[in-house]
C-alpha cells in the first residue's frame, strides 16, 4: 500500500498508508491530519485542502485542471509552483512515498 507523508509547517511529519484510488485529502481526513480543512468535501470548490507537492512527485499526477487552477488563485496561503488541491490528487502505486507539505493556514 502506498504511503503519503504529510509535513506540517513546523516540520512535524505524519506518514499514512493510503489505499490506491483514494485521494490525498481523504487520507488526511481519515487519519486526523490537522491542516486539511476540506470544507467542500472534495469538490474542488473551496481551496481549503491546499498542499504543496514538490518534484519528483508533482510530475506523477495529471496536470492542473482549469477548475483547480482557478481555486488555487483563492488560497489563503501563498500559491507556488508546487501548489495543488489535495482533493484532486489520487493515490496510485506510482506515488508511493509521496511527500506533501501543508500550508501555514487554510482559512
UniProtKB/Swiss-Prot annotation:
A GO cellular component entry from the record: cytosol
Cofactor binding notes: Binds 1 [2Fe-2S] cluster.
CDD domains: fer2 (cd00207)
A Pfam cross-reference name: Fer2
Cofactor: [2Fe-2S] cluster
Amino-acid positions noted as binding [2Fe-2S] cluster in the UniProt annotation, renumbered to this chain: 40, 46, 49, 87
GO BP terms: P450-containing electron transport chain
Top-rank taxon: Bacteria
Keywords: 2Fe-2S, Electron transport, Iron, Iron-sulfur, Metal-binding, Transport
Any GO MF annotation of the entry: metal ion binding
Positions of the 2Fe-2S ferredoxin-type domain: 2-106
UniProt xrefs under InterPro entries: 2Fe-2S_ferredoxin-like_sf, 2Fe-2S_ferredoxin-type, Adrenodoxin-like, Adrenodoxin_Fe-S_BS, Beta-grasp_dom_sf
UniProt similarity note: Belongs to the adrenodoxin/putidaredoxin family.
Function text: Ferredoxin-type protein which transfers electrons from rhodocoxin reductase to cytochrome CYP116 (ThcB), which is involved in the degradation of thiocarbamate herbicides.
Name the record gives this protein: Rhodocoxin
Species for this entry: Rhodococcus erythropolis (Arthrobacter picolinophilus)
Classification lineage: Bacteria, Bacillati, Actinomycetota, Actinomycetes, Mycobacteriales
Amino acid at each position: 500500500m502506498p504511503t503519503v507523508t504529510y509535513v506540517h509547517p513546523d516540520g512535524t511529519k505524519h506518514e499514512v498508508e493510503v489505499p490506491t484510488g483514494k485521494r490525498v485529502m481523504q487520507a488526511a481526513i481519515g487519519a486526523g491530519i490537522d491542516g486539511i480543512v476540506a470544507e467542500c468535501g472534495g469538490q474542488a470548490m473551496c481551496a481549503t485542502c491546499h498542499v504543496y507537492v514538490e518534484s519528483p512527485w508533482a510530475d506523477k499526477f495529471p496536470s492542473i485542471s482549469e477548475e483547480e487552477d482557478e481555486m488555487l488563485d483563492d488560497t489563503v496561503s501563498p500559491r507556488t509552483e508546487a501548489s495543488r488541491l489535495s482533493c484532486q490528487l489520487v493515490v496510485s502505486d506510482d506515488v508511493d512515498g509521496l511527500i506533501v507539505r501543508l500550508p501555514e493556514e487554510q482559512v
